[in-house]
């Protein structure tokens, strides 16, 4: 019996697809995340994200669109404390995600659904420069493999591996209410030794790299509003299972639009729209929406 190349590639990808829908990319930033609050401030944030996808492109292959799709809903609770350490502003924080993956299919093949806790994220940005109008920060992120993971399933919320992301970025005021934020990061992956079953299938992944740029405008006449436009590019992240490439990577270009409003001096509501314009090695997000609510203390 012979199997076509396209069918073979779909089968291989479907067997290991759990990773493509998890946060395997580097860390996304909102438009003013690198502007710190004063030392002594606490912040609680809640994120609610919905995304829909209707095509998948394996690395170096053709787009698979017919019978392909995946929806997800993810909520994240985040706690941040800003403090002064030896003259530098530091913000230790923890992020706790909970997600659901559903309506998954690839080339007509149904994918498992999944729900549960995601991998907790620990981070502590350090602002090396924190001047009026200019900031520059070093931001490490540690992903702890404590999320929901069922070995061998095509979709999982947790990743069953350690990850470490190192990010550099800063903000520069441009005048007349305009601000730009630029950042770059590199993400290192540990191995998942249970990728295809308990104790079977060793998944390895190359480093992922990402650039993000934002331009924001806050009306001088009403500084409770901010509108922002952004772009992100990711590359690298090619995956192998037991030494064989599985058609997945983290190569993408994405555009973003964000609107935020302080409804009180300590409560901000923010909406974010994202859309992939190019993907090689994964699902293409047609629509990615996020509602963020932040409370400062």
Regions found by a protein language model. Name each.
Residues 23-45, 53-55:
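Outer-membrane beta-barrel biogenesis signature
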Residues 40, 69-75, 88, 111-120, ...:
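Residues that define the transmembrane beta-barrel architecture of outer-membrane proteins
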Residues 48, 81-83, 126-128, 168, ...:
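Residue-level signature of outer-membrane beta-barrel architecture
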Residues 48-54, 96-102, 128, 142-148, ...:
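Transmembrane beta-strands of outer-membrane beta-barrel pores
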Residues 51-74, 109-113, 155:
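Surface-exposed strand-loop-strand hairpins of Gram-negative outer-membrane beta-barrel proteins
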Residues 54-55, 87-90, 132-135, 177-180, ...:
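Repeated loop/turn-to-beta-strand initiation elements of outer-membrane beta-barrel proteins
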Residues 57, 63-65, 199-297:
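Outer membrane beta-barrel transmembrane domains
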Residues 99-204, 248:
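Outer-membrane pore/translocation modules
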